[in-house]
């Protein structure tokens, strides 16, 4: 046997033993025998570097090389799931799917593991890339760190896997490992991790993969993407993936009825406490991939899946005082300051009270014993008061009437729960909040700038709005507190680089009320530049897919404000991308210009989302509901009877897939 053949043999043996131990939980050799094989392979690879392989089992030990992570675009967006704590909303989801498909379907029920999401790409049976969720469109390349996780295969078993595919899952830290890690940190008098999810996420982002390897992370894989997948069934594909070497949850179950779904939920609401990893709910997915494609996606999440989250834990503690925070939109949020209490693995000292109505409804008094819950929110919330122990309490909590920062009288818009400070041009937290939003990662992504730096620049009078950032020079900021030459240069470089940020993110960065990332993308697709957007009327805005009257009026109000128009003009002068680039417009036609189109039914040739893109590409507008202004309906199979009746009553043309594709060809 040649040296090369011996190395290959050892690699195959170690991959198999690794799989037996970490995935099947059925080791065939002792730890010492495994270590001996590993040492033999390490020695041979060291003596023969010409046979180096990035997917060798020796790569799992990690390295102490320090590096920054590069960002990688996801081939398929990593959207989050819509979630609920309500069984009624699970029923609503099931009914929506049944109505939309109008045919038999199965629901795959899975544990919702509480870790950090990962996307793994394999080519020719080898792991080539591991990327975090990031912002859903791009994430950090953490391949070297993921290679240290022994339950993730570097090389696949068998040969019936697709040539290229992606598999997604959750990186986890088992409870036992988490508790041991926190004991070590406590002994070193270091801050403890709040929960296993934070520990897993923090570990995955460490620069030293040798430390990552020592943390004993685990992984469950839960979704397969790509061409030429084994079957049309999600559940069936994962069973195949298990044969290739992936760790797939054995707790998955296919359900034929809603009652079976609830039986699964109710069983695991109790039994999950006996699992060795953290879980916080159940994920429900339509099993057929074809049916998934037909159901499509909303802007933020798939229509074919939902996460049911188990009810949050709650704790009882004392309310000491209520303080108030002013956000970038001027919204004033009351915050309860509490005696520290342990809740869901974290120490809670503050909780949101949301608005004046909540305070009034709870009949809060200073000194009350209050119930605190922590569900999906980052900040816990107060859900009740234990009035049975109410004695020696202080005064009743009353919502403030004036801004705690600038003293302006607060206002409350009709139909809204929040109170607002109207002084948007001179209230410090609003100004700083707008700038912090502008520079944030999902907006202009300006490296080197953070809340503390923004606060310092504002206090020193260097910036008063976002456009002032583009007037800064290294001389302006060099020598400021903790600001050396290199830091100053990096900040100015980051500001200059932000001029290349695309139109949709600049729109988001403006901070227009109710205009989030998704709406900003819709706007950027609908207008060729900021001037078109500034001059758009209410009807034009409402006709944009997923933009209702509330968002449309907010956009109109923003541009009706002269100071906002001047700010946008200054940003334009600074060189920001306030227009769609020519390459975005290439391939676009005006074949559907001026037409408002409703999509309904289940399609064969393309998904609903693909048809929406085609409509926009050819100058049309996607609208969600039928009206007298609808140009035509693009109808697939099983179009809803209510829409059919309304279209008939209004005399609106119904077009099938073939007719539509011919129209735009």
Curated annotation (Swiss-Prot):
Highest taxon, organism lineage: Bacteria
UniProt cross-references to SMART domains, sorted A to Z: BRCT, HhH1, LIGANc
Keywords annotated in UniProt: DNA damage, DNA repair, DNA replication, Ligase, Magnesium, Manganese, Metal-binding, NAD, Zinc
Domain BRCT: 587-665
Recorded GO MF terms: DNA binding; DNA ligase (NAD+) activity; metal ion binding
Residues the entry annotates as binding Zn(2+): 403, 406, 421, 427
Protein family membership: Belongs to the NAD-dependent DNA ligase family. LigA subfamily.
Protein name: DNA ligase
């Amino acid at each position: 046997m040649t040296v090369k053949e011996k190395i290959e043999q050892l690699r195959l043996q170690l991959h198999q033993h690794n799989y037996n131990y970490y995935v099947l939980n059925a080791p065939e050799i002792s730890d010492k025998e495994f270590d001996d094989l590993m040492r033999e392979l390490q020695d041979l690879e060291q003596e023969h570097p010409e046979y180096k392989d990035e997917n060798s089992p020796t790569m799992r030990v990690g390295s102490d090389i320090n590096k920054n992570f590069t960002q990688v675009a996801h081939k398929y967006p990593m959207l989050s799931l819509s979630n609920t704590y309500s069984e009624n909303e699970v029923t609503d989801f099931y009914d929506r799917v049944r109505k939309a498909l109008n045919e038999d379907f199965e629901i795959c029920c899975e544990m919702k593991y509480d870790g950090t999401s990962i996307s793994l790409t394999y080519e020719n049976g080898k792991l080539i890339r591991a990327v975090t969720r990031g912002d859903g469109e791009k994430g950090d390349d953490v391949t070297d760190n993921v290679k240290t996780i022994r339950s993730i295969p570097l090389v696949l078993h068998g040969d019936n896997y697709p040539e290229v595919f992606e598999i997604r899952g959750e990186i986890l830290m088992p409870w036992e490992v988490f508790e041991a890690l926190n004991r070590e940190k406590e002994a070193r008098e270091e801050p403890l991790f709040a929960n296993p999810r934070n520990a897993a996420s923090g570990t995955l982002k460490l620069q030293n993969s040798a430390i990552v390897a020592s943390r004993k992370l685990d992984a469950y894989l839960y979704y397969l993407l790509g061409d030429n997948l084994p079957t049309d069934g999600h559940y069936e594909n994962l069973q195949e993936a298990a044969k290739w070497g992936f760790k797939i949850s054995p707790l998955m179950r296919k359900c034929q009825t809603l009652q079976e779904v609830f039986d699964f939920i109710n069983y695991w609401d109790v039994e999950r406490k006996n699992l060795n990893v953290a879980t916080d709910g159940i994920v429900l997915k339509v099993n057929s991939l074809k049916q998934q494609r037909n159901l499509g996606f909303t802007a933020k999440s798939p229509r074919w899946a939902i996460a049911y989250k188990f009810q949050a834990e709650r704790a009882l503690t004392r309310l000491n005082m209520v303080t108030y925070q002013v956000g970038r939109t001027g919204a004033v949020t009351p915050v309860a300051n509490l005696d520290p209490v342990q809740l869901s693995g974290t120490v809670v000292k503050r909780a949101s009270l949301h608005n004046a109505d909540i305070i009034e409804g709870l009949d809060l008094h200073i000194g009350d014993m209050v119930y605190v819950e922590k569900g999906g929110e980052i900040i816990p919330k107060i859900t009740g008061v234990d009035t049975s122990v109410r004695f020696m309490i202080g005064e009743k909590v009353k919502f403030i009437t004036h801004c705690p920062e600038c003293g302006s009288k607060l206002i409350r818009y009709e139909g809204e729960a929040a109170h607002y400070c109207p002084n948007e041009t001179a209230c410090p937290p609003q100004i700083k909040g707008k700038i912090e939003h502008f520079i944030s990662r999902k907006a202009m992504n300006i490296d080197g700038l953070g809340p503390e730096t923004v606060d310092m620049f504002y206090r020193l009078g260097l910036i008063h709005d976002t456009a002032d950032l583009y007037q800064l020079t290294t001389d302006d900021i060099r020598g400021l507190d903790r600001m050396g030459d290199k830091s100053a240069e990096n900040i100015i470089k980051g500001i200059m680089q932000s001029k290349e940020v695309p139109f949709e993110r600049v729109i988001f960065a403006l901070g227009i009320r109710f205009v989030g990332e998704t709406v900003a993308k819709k706007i950027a697709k609908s207008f060729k530049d900021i001037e078109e957007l500034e001059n758009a009327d209410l009807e034009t805005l409402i006709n944009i897919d997923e933009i209702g009257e509330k968002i449309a009026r907010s956009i109109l109000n923003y541009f009706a404000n002269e100071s906002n128009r001047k700010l946008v003009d200054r940003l334009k002068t600074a060189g920001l991308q306030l227009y769609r680039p020519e390459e975005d417009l290439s391939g676009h036609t005006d074949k559907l210009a001026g037409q408002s189109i409703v999509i309904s039914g289940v399609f064969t040739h393309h998904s609903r989302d693909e048809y929406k893109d085609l409509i926009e590409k050819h100058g049309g507008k996607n609208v969600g509901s039928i009206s007298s202004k609808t140009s035509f309906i693009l109808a697939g199979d099983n179009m809803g009877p209510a829409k059919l009746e309304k279209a008939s009553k209004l005399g609106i043309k119904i077009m099938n897939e073939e007719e539509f594709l011919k129209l735009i060809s």
